[in-house]
Amino acid sequence: MEFRDQVLDLLTEVAETNVIKENPDVELFEEGIIDSFQTVGLLLEIQNKLDIEVSIMDFDRDEWATPNKIVAVLEELR
C-alpha cells in the first residue's frame, strides 16, 4: 500500500468519515471533521501505525489543515 493511502486510511479511521478520501482537500478543522481530542488520537496513530513521531508542539493547524497537507508533512518527516 502506498504511503499516501496509508495516511488517508488512518485519517478516515480517526475522523470516522469517508469524506477524507472523497475530498482530500477538505478543511478538517474548519468543517469540524476533526476536533482537538481526535488530533491527539491522530498523532498517536501516526506514531503507532506509521512509526513517525510528531509532538503536539510540532503540530500546526494550518500546516495540517487538509488530508493532502497532512500527507505532505508526513512525507517530509518519514
UniProtKB/Swiss-Prot annotation:
Q: Which domain of life is it from?
A: Bacteria
Which stretches make up the Carrier domain?
1-78
Q: How is it modified after translation?
A: 4'-phosphopantetheine is transferred from CoA to a specific serine of apo-DCP.
Q: Where are the transmembrane segments?
A: none
Its subcellular locations are: Cytoplasm
A GO-annotated cellular component: cytoplasm
SUPFAM superfamilies attached here? Answer: ACP-like
Q: Which GO terms describe its molecular function?
A: D-alanyl carrier activity
Q: In which pathway does it act?
A: Cell wall biogenesis; lipoteichoic acid biosynthesis
Q: Does the keyword S-adenosyl-L-methionine apply?
A: no
- Keywords on record: Cell wall biogenesis/degradation, Cytoplasm, Phosphopantetheine, Phosphoprotein
Q: Which HAMAP family match?
A: DltC
State the function annotated in the UniProt record: Carrier protein involved in the D-alanylation of lipoteichoic acid (LTA). The loading of thioester-linked D-alanine onto DltC is catalyzed by D-alanine--D-alanyl carrier protein ligase DltA. The DltC-carried D-alanyl group is further transferred to cell membrane phosphatidylglycerol (PG) by forming an ester bond, probably catalyzed by DltD. D-alanylation of LTA plays an important role in modulating the properties of the cell wall in Gram-positive bacteria, influencing the net charge of the cell wall.
The protein in question is named: D-alanyl carrier protein
Gene that encodes the chain: dltC
